[in-house]
């Protein structure tokens, strides 16, 4: 397996003081997950300078991503604990234009999981990518970036993100969102959309709100401010203050809920049932094709070997025949010479008898 990065930033177990939501997931999520904890593997792709580290560290209320990381694949793996419930969180970042290394990484993690499934030990870490946050630039998307999103959407749950939403007016932001939706539709890019179950009670309204606001436009901040008598995460400007948790101003809270509250289990299940199963199917098809190719090659080699042996056998038979013919000629010649000699002797004897 190639392009598997080493863990460059491991903070171990982090007990967070500001709840992010995974310890109070809905009843629809398996009870066993509440006991054993949760796993989430997040891939973040996009140009450098769009606020990846600030966004991720804000979502999980922990310093998971280092601002000094490289543009190549960088992985962090940690455990964060909220109200005695743990979340095993893996963050992989990548900021180059060519996403071949990312696709190789996704396939390598799928292959690792596949190999572990075939082994004796069934308890192993799930390192497959559960969701990809694709950070969109404020200027025009390039053809390469559109292609990148399409290819990623074929391999994992893609969630396009409009970062730094505070640089737009409400009307501008509405236009940006509509433009992104149009690009996704025109290029057959299927982003992750939560399943809306009308029988989920209050959760139905919450999920409907999340779906209606996609693609998400977010504002992130790791800084806490005292504002209006409260300690709030937000951003200060000359003209005022933005509380990033306020859903009227941006979709940060909706994105956070999607990842670690309302749809955490759906992301992992879709990874397993759709993307990973597609990968397994390809592996089996390749192995079957390889088996057929090996069988065909074996038959060709066997046929060729028999032909060579037959050719050698026929050549040997011909050589023996030739040798036999030569021996036949040799003995025939010797017999002829002997007969001639015997005839000559007989003539001489007969002649001597006449003389006497």
From Swiss-Prot:
One of its GO terms (molecular function) is GTP binding. It comes from the Eukaryota. GTP binds at residues 46-53, 70, 164-172, 235. Keywords: Cell cycle, Cell division, GTP-binding, Nucleotide-binding. The keyword Cell division applies. PROSITE patterns: G_SEPTIN. Belongs to the TRAFAC class TrmE-Era-EngA-EngB-Septin-like GTPase superfamily. Septin GTPase family. This is Cell division control protein 10. It comes from Encephalitozoon cuniculi (strain GB-M1) (Microsporidian parasite). The gene is CDC10.
């Amino acid at each position: 397996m190639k392009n598997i990065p080493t863990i460059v930033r491991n903070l171990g177990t982090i007990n967070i003081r500001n709840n992010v939501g995974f310890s109070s997931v809905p009843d629809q999520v398996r009870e066993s997950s509440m006991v054993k904890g949760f796993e989430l593997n997040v891939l973040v792709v996009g140009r450098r300078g769009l606020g990846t580290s600030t966004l991720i560290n804000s979502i999980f209320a922990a310093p998971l991503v280092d601002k000094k990381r490289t543009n190549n694949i960088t992985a962090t793996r940690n455990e964060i604990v909220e109200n005695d419930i743990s979340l095993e969180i893996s963050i992989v970042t990548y900021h180059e234009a060519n996403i071949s290394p990312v696709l190789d990484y996704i396939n390598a993690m799928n292959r690792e999981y596949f190999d572990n499934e075939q082994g004796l030990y069934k308890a192993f870490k799930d390192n497959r990518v559960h969701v990809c946050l694709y950070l969109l630039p404020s200027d025009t998307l390039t053809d390469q970036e559109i292609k990148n999103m399409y290819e990623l959407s074929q391999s994992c749950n893609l969630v396009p993100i409009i970062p730094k939403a505070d640089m737009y007016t409400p009307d501008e932001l509405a236009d940006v969102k509509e433009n992104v939706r149009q690009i996704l539709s025109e290029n057959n890019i299927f982003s992750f959309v939560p399943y809306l179950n009308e029988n989920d009670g209050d959760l139905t309204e919450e999920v409907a709100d999340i779906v209606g606001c996609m693609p998400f436009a977010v504002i992130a901040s790791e800084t806490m401010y005292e504002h209006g008598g409260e300690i709030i995460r937000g951003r200060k400007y000359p003209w005022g203050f933005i509380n990033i948790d306020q859903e009227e101003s941006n979709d940060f809270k909706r994105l956070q809920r999607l990842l670690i509250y309302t749809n955490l289990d759906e992301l992992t299940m879709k990874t397993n049932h759709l993307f990973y199963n597609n990968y397994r199917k390809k592996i089996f098809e390749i192995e079957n094709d390889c088996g057929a190719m090996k069988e065909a090659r074996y038959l060709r080699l066997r046929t060729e070997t028999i032909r060579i042996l037959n050719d050698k056998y026929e050549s040997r038979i011909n050589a023996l025949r030739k040798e036999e013919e030569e021996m036949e000629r040799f003995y025939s010649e010797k017999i002829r010479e002997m007969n001639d000699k015997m005839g000559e002797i007989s003539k001489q004897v007969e002649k001597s008898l006449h003389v006497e």
